[in-house]
């Protein structure tokens, strides 16, 4: 038996080197950096697995020979979710909450399309059902442990439970309109948690042990599972106050206080607001109504990147080494958004101070500004970071409505304001934020978002690390000093957190 056993081990040693695959990997360009594949060998076989991994690399995908924390998608063939978990356990391998466990059909469709395809429910291998007791799951009936903090969860744009998160987002918005902060935060937390789950919710038992899901949230989920909809959500969407506030707050320059004032005055629609000549509006609100159709339509990634290039071309004329960064949802990988946020700094101390006013002058002279409001810096370096998780920062900034030419080639050519009179442009909301270089990593982290991610990051710093974090810096209360950071990775490290890429922060 010994000679047979030894001979059987020989080819396994040769395969372990995997030199040809490693070399091949280096030869292929990676097109989809946000995706790392791991193919389960069980029922697939070594030869087929090697072939499929090489095929994926040729298509621009990253693959891992061994399962690691970098893996985002586990692909299995002819296996159930429970079987995959059992195989991982037998190999003493694990996976994180950010990992999708998928059937080979998803992989096949990706190879045919030459790009990652959207994950559908039919692609998912449920990991919640029939979980073996041998796995010793950390939660009562859940095979996935989920942190109460969004900054400890990977949340991509692939929301497999959108029917539930959309419902919670509507209810959160409803309570925000009612100025009920407690219930607003509760539904935002619940929505954020569900967005991070790597499996579709199909039964109530899958929710056991998960944080932030109270009886009311569970009741809504159960109703949707049984009825396909939530009557509470439908009731809210039909409420007169909700519908009016939804319209009012969509106007640039209109917040909750103004919406409440208009509602108490008897206004219910934007048409009524527009037709009331005696109503006093701020300049910002007038512009918001004047360019309402453009502003409320989505900004595409192409439009956001065109705006970024426009700002870069202007800023670099004054400060060639300035750092100009597109932030917000677009930095998190979104294909569309409501506005464009751009962060500007310079490594040479003090060089950033005149950038904003100079940039506004150029835009104004080119006839590309429909509205702008500059807010000067109110930062006080003697003060500690704010204790409030929703606190605004104190950077110099400008809120604008930009007249963006629809053809990118027009950007550098427009000098005469009259050239913009024809409607060959689109009104786009643009926020420019100027930050000192030493505060740039914190500003970049804060302006990248998402809102719930940043809220939980600050809460985590306060409650778990006795630190104070905002867009200006990180203060360690145990050492009574500010901590320096050269980049976002340093901030995560100082907080003792695993680094999450921007596209993993869509909480």
Swiss-Prot record:
InterPro entries: BRCT_dom, BRCT_dom_sf, DNA-dir_DNA_pol_X, DNA_pol-X_BS, DNA_pol_b-like_N, DNA_pol_B_palm_palm, DNA_pol_lambd_fingers_domain, DNA_pol_lamdba_lyase_dom_sf. Residues 254-258 are annotated as: Involved in DNA binding. Can also utilize other divalent cations, such as Mn(2+) and Co(2+) (in vitro). One of its GO terms (biological process) is double-strand break repair via nonhomologous end joining. Its EC number is 2.7.7.31. A 2'-deoxyribonucleoside 5'-triphosphate binds at residues 329-334, 338-341, 446-447. Its main location: nucleus. The keyword Transferase applies. Belongs to the DNA polymerase type-X family. This is DNA nucleotidylexotransferase.
């Amino acid at each position: 038996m010994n000679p047979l056993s030894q001979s059987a081990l020989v080819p396994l040693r040769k395969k372990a080197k995997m030199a040809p695959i490693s070399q091949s990997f280096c030869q292929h360009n990676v097109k989809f950096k946000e995706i790392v594949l791991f193919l389960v060998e069980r029922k697939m076989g070594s030869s087929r697995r090697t072939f499929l991994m090489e095929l994926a690399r040729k298509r621009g995908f990253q693959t891992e020979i061994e399962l690691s924390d970098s893996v985002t998608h586990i692909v299995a063939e002819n296996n159930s979710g429970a079987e995959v978990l059992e195989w991982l356990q037998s190999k003493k391998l694990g996976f994180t909450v950010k990992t999708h466990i998928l059937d080979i059909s998803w992989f096949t469709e990706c190879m045919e399309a030459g790009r990652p395809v959207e994950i559908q429910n039919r692609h998912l291998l449920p990991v919640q059902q029939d979980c073996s007791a041998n796995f010793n799951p950390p939660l009562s009936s859940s095979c996935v442990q989920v942190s109460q903090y969004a900054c400890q969860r990977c949340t991509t744009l692939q929301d497999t439970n959108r029917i539930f998160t959309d419902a919670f987002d509507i209810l959160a918005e409803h309570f925000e309109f009612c100025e009920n902060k407690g219930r607003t935060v509760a539904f935002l937390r619940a929505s954020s948690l569900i967005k991070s789950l790597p499996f579709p919710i199909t039964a109530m038992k899958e929710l056991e042990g998960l944080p932030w899901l109270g009886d009311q949230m569970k009741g809504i989920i159960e109703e949707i599972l049984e009825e396909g909809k939530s009557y509470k959500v439908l009731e809210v969407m039909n409420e007169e106050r909700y519908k009016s506030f939804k319209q009012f707050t969509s106007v640039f320059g209109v917040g909750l206080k103004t919406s409440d004032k208009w509602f108490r005055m008897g206004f219910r629609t934007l048409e009524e607001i527009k037709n009331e000549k005696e109503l006093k509006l701020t300049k910002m609100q007038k512009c918001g109504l004047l360019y309402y159709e453009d502003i409320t339509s989505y900004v595409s990634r192409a439009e956001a990147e065109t705006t970024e290039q426009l700002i870069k071309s202007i800023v670099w004329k004054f400060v060639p080494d300035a750092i100009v960064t597109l932030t917000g949802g677009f930095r998190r990988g979104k294909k569309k958004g409501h506005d464009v946020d751009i962060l500007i700094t310079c490594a040479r101390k003090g060089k950033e101070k005149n950038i904003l006013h100079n940039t506004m002058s150029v835009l104004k002279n080119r006839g590309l500004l429909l509205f702008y409001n500059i807010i000067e810096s109110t930062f006080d370096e003697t003060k500690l970071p704010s204790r409030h998780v929703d606190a605004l920062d104190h950077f110099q900034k400008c809120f604008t409505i930009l007249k963006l030419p629809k053809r990118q080639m027009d950007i550098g050519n427009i000098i005469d304001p009259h050239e913009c009179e024809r409607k060959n442009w689109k009104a786009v909301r643009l926020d420019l934020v100027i930050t000192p270089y030493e505060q740039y990593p914190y500003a970049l982290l804060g302006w990248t978002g998402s809102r719930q991610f940043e809220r939980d990051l600050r809460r985590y710093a306060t409650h778990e690390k006795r630190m104070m974090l905002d867009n200006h810096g990180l203060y360690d209360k145990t050492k009574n000093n500010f901590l320096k950071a050269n980049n976002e990775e340093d901030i995560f490290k100082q907080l003792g957190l695993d680094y999450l890429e921007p596209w993993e922060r869509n909480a």
